[in-house]
């Protein structure tokens, strides 16, 4: 499929993860991590093969066209080294310009990104973290300039980057219009009122340039302002909608590496006169971990396609993806670490310690670009309006048109229109296409053409799960209505608001994964068509703790073992990895 071809080329271009002389190998990643070394050579290589083009819209000379494309490019990097992935991902902060910049700014920033610029995001401050409205960095307007004062702290690429996406106060009040957004070219500010803050040592991704920048009467031109004065919070939050969705690439890459290493260990390790992989409990654990990874991938794919199909709903979709995808991979990590046993605690006793690096690195994914608490808080305040928008649509729903739109969202074979970032909204009043799709999903599960080849037992289980999702949806809708209709309760029971957001997110995810499978089933490889992995995921996500049926476990595990033995990504996509003896080749990844 076209949306995965660039990532497939990148994977082959980067060479084998087992080549010790390769900057993109696991051994190189571990060596840099031990030295806390910034991956500059890897960054230069990625620029040379044209990956930077995928952050710039096509009308500005780039290749930023397909949501899934950038997701999988970063997944390819993340399975090798989350430090490289995190460093290079700061290019995505240019989205703030595509959202709010004027024509000249868009062209100028596009040229900078295409020439290899290294941007950073300067939102957070040491005293305030994610509380942007409490920001203390100020931008005082003069006739032709802004004068900056204050410090931005804990910023990726703050020192080594050459550009900054900055949020600063342009008003003394604390309201939402007190902040403005700027794009700074640090090359024009050298020694002119700016200074670097010390690099911060980190638990994982130790080679990152996590530092800060300070301003002391630093002057910038008025044309550094993105959008209008007072639009900073709006533009910043819209940009975060996009970057939060792409954070899932970190989880997918780390999850692939951890599950691959743990499975290979189980295949090789012998205990009690038999291979560990032959132990039923271990087989169950690995099958469950694989189901989590596939579900995380599917939720990420649906999110990426949502940027095309219903971008005005993305203010609720993005926090769901950002919360749950890392959580699914954290569950995978908990499972696979138990498979490794004592080897998990030893830093380099197996696979040179790459599992431990991926485990450490992934710990921060649920925090950056908005923690789970921040994301659920954002989601919770939109539950009423999203449900209201969905209810309005239900009254005027054309079933044929609705199904075509659901297919556009879920079906990977259906090409989507280009993303228009200017259509992003701060608040979702349009409804929820995933939640709306459940009725059609249930209809398709009762359609003999859609379910041909499924066993009676599997079909019965999936129909039962889908019906249960509908019951849960109606119950949750009522709870949301009751909560927001009682203003006193809304003020008093804040924890209930978070609980409703959590319930909404988890329901959304299960519907999305089921919907993806229903609409793509006949295009998936046979091992995934039978729904075994899906049932394991749905059962686990619903809190069922009893072991999966043996046939479900074995069907899922067989596919996992096949992906590893044939050197494929652990994915719903048939994605071949670079051969074990492949060398990196500095070749353009664009056709």
What is the predicted function of each stretch?
Residues 54, 115-124:
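A short, Trp-centered hydrophobic/proline-enriched beta-strand micro-motif
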Residues 149-195:
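A short core secondary-structure module
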Residues 263-264, 281-311, 326, 519:
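Loop-to-helix element that buttresses phosphate recognition and phosphoryl-transfer chemistry
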Residues 137-140:
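A structural signal for short hydrophobic beta-strand segments in well-ordered beta-sheet cores
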Residues 202-293, 404-508, 512:
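Glycine-rich beta->alpha junctions and the first turn(s) of the following alpha-helix
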Residues 82-104, 129-132, 142-145, 267:
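N-terminal glycine-rich flavin-associated loop
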Residues 1-88, 108, 424-492, 501-504, ...:
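Amphipathic, small/basic residue-rich leader segments at the start of a protein or domain
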Residues 303-402:
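Extended amphipathic alpha-helical segments with heptad-repeat/coiled-coil character used for oligomerization
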């Amino acid at each position: 499929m076209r949306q995965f071809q660039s990532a497939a080329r990148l994977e082959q271009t980067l060479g084998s993860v087992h080549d010790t002389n390769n900057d993109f190998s696991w051994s190189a990643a571990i060596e840099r991590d031990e030295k806390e070394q910034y991956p500059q050579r890897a960054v230069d290589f990625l620029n040379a093969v044209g990956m930077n083009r995928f952050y710039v819209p096509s009308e500005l000379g780039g290749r930023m066209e397909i949501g899934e494309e950038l997701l999988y490019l970063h997944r390819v990097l993340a399975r090798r080294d989350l430090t490289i992935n995190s460093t290079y991902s700061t290019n995505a902060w240019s989205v703030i310009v595509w959202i709010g910049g004027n024509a000249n700014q868009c062209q100028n920033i596009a040229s900078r990104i295409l020439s290899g610029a290294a941007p950073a995001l300067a939102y957070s401050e040491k005293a305030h973290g994610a509380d942007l409205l409490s920001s203390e960095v100020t931008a005082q307007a003069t006739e032709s300039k802004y004068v900056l004062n204050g410090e931005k702290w804990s910023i990726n690429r703050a020192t080594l980057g050459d550009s900054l996406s900055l949020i600063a106060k342009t008003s003394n009040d604390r309201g939402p219009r007190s902040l403005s957004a700027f794009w700074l070219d640090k090359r024009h500010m050298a020694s002119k009122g700016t200074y670097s803050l010390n690099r911060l040592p980190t638990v994982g991704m130790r080679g990152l340039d996590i530092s800060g920048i300070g301003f002391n009467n630093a002057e910038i031109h008025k044309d550094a302002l993105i959008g209008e004065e007072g639009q900073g919070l709006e533009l910043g939050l819209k940009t975060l909608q996009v970057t939060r969705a792409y954070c899932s690439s970190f989880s997918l890459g780390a999850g692939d590496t951890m599950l691959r290493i743990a499975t290979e260990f189980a295949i090789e390790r012998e205990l009690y006169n038999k291979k560990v992989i032959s132990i039923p409990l271990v087989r169950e654990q690995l099958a469950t971990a694989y189901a989590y990874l596939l579900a995380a991938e599917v939720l990420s794919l649906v999110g990426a396609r949502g940027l095309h199909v219903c971008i005005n709903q993305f203010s609720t979709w993005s926090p769901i993806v950002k919360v749950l995808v890392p959580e699914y991979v954290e569950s995978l990590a908990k499972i696979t670490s138990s498979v490794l046993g004592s080897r998990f605690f030893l830093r380099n006793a197996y696979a040179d310690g790459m599992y431990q690096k991926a485990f450490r690195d992934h710990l921060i994914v649920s925090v950056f670009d908005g923690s789970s608490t921040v994301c659920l808080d954002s989601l919770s305040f939109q539950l009423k309006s999203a449900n209201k928008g969905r209810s309005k649509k239900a009254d005027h729903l054309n079933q044929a048109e609705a199904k075509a739109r659901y297919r556009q969202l879920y079906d990977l074979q259906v090409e989507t229109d280009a993303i228009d970032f200017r259509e992003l909204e701060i608040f979702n009043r349009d409804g929820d296409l995933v939640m709306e799709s459940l009725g059609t999903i249930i209809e398709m599960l009762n359609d003999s053409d859609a379910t041909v080849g499924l066993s009676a037992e599997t079909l019965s289980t999936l129909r039962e799960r889908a019906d249960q999702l509908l019951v849960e949806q109606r119950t949750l809708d009522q709870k949301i209505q009751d909560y927001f209709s009682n203003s006193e309760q809304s003020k008093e029971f804040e924890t209930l608001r978070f609980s409703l957001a959590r319930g909404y997110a988890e329901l959304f995810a299960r519907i999305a994964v089921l919907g993806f499978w229903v609409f793509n089933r006949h295009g998936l490889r046979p091992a995934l068509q039978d729904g075994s992995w899906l049932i394991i995921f749905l059962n686990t996500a619903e809190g069922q703790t009893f072991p999966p049926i043996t046939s479900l476990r074995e069907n899922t595990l067989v596919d996992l073992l096949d992906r590893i033995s044939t050197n494929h990504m652990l994915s719903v996509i048939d994605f071949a990895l670079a051969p074990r003896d492949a060398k990196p080749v500095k070749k353009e990844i664009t056709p």
